[in-house]
A protein has these predicted regions:
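Walker A/P-loop NTP-binding motif
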Residues: 110-122
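N-terminal accessory segments
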Residues: 1-94
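Conserved RecA-like ASCE ATPase "motif II neighborhood" in helicase/translocase motors
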Residues: 169-231
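Walker A/P-loop
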Residues: 93-113
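ATPase catalytic-site recognition across NTP-hydrolyzing enzymes
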Residues: 283-349
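ASCE P-loop NTPase helicase motor core
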Residues: 216-292
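A short acidic (Asp/Glu
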Residues: 108-111, 138-142, 253-260
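Conserved nucleotide-state-sensing and coupling region of NTP-binding domains
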Residues: 130-187
Length: 349
């Protein structure tokens, strides 16, 4: 068996250019680190596989470096989101809404990692993923697909994709599973989430369905809400197909407010994660069809590594953005001046 080149072999023949030497050293360190990681996974595959298949959080921590190139800085909200998503995988939750501030890795967690873990659990799983942003839809779908192709994922779950369906908008596994990724306002036809087989077989994921610029539009906002009835529900293979909606709040009558108030008829488990946790906060009376999840997080900043109390005080200077996107309690247009230019657009994470 041919041995790997030594560091001295790698540097042999180089000029004395310091930049060239440093570049080669960095490449060598990266190569060795990757080889060591691959060896760790191969030698501990059974333990890693069992741990990851039992916990969305463990799966995310294990796979995140192979997606982002660095480890995940876990915050309290990650554990809360993962616990809720684990209930979806276990078949214990059929309707889930998660409200969380922008920039808190919601798309990576409930999008990329949820999709990849779903295919790890069942290569025949079928997902529909939708968001207001076509760019985000393609990026999330592509990231999930690319993560599944990594040597690290393949060493644990050797899932194969059909070569004739490897586009970012739609792709399939050789086993018959697949993903359709489409904008919330676009066409979603020819594909249904989940199969009729027992166990976890996929889900419908709706990630930020409403564009921030359209939050105050009495035309666009109701149109997106109506698509719950006209488009999304018709793409479910049966009524018990799991649905995960993860979004920042933008308006009292955005899709979260619309569904939690009973407009869709379904009851929803609701994980509400404001940027500042206040255990004395009362669940909104108008959410007649919401079942609040007790996340058990301690009072204070939701993710101190991202927003300290001082940072949050600065966010509060704009009450419209803060109340909606950060506090998850948007102000009613009739209660204050509400202008769409107050809202900040986030296309990722």
């Amino acid at each position: 068996m041919k041995s790997s080149p030594s560091l001295s072999d790698s540097l042999a023949g180089l000029s004395q250019n310091p930049q060239e030497i440093l570049h080669r050293l960095r490449m060598e360190r990266e190569r060795r680190a990757k080889a060591a990681e691959q060896k760790r996974i191969e030698e501990n595959a059974a333990e890693i596989r069992a741990r990851c298949e039992a916990s969305h959080l463990e799966f995310s921590k294990e796979m995140f470096p192979h997606l982002e190139g660095a480890g995940l800085r876990v915050g309290p909200h990650h554990a809360a989101m993962s616990t809720a998503l684990d209930r979806v995988f276990a078949g214990q939750c059929k309707r889930l809404i998660i409200n969380v501030p922008p920039g808190y890795t919601k798309t990576v967690f409930a999008g990329v990692m949820f999709l990849a873990m779903g295919f790890a659990l069942n290569p025949r799983a079928r997902f529909i993923y939708s968001s207001f942003s076509e760019a985000l839809v393609k990026e999330t779908s592509g990231n999930a697909r690319d993560l599944m192709k990594t040597p690290e994922f393949q060493a644990l779950w050797p899932r194969q994709l059909r070569k004739d369906t490897e586009g970012k908008g739609r792709w399939k596994t050789l086993e018959g599973g697949g993903l359709l990724a489409a904008p919330a306002g676009g066409t979603i036809t020819g594909f249904r989430a989940v199969t009729m087989e027992p166990g976890f077989t996929g889900a419908l994921i709706i990630d930020d369905p409403l564009k921030p610029d359209d939050a105050d539009s009495d035309t666009e906002r109701p149109k997106i809400n109506k698509r719950w009835h006209t488009t999304f529900k018709s793409r479910l293979a049966h009524e018990d197909v799991p649905v995960v909606i993860i979004m920042q709040r933008l308006h009292p009558d955005d899709m979260s407010g619309y569904l939690l108030s009973g407009e869709g008829g379904d009851e929803w488990e609701h994980l509400m994660l404001p940027v500042m946790i206040d255990p004395d906060e009362i669940y909104p009376d108008e959410f007649t069809h919401g079942r609040p999840i007790d996340h058990g997080l301690k009072p204070g900043p939701l993710w101190p590594a991202k927003h300290t109390e001082k940072h949050i005080e600065l966010l509060q200077h704009d009450e419209f953005v803060y109340s909606a996107q950060y506090a998850q309690r948007p102000i009613a247009p009739g209660g204050a001046i509400f202008r769409e230019e107050h809202l900040v657009g986030w296309d990722e994470l």
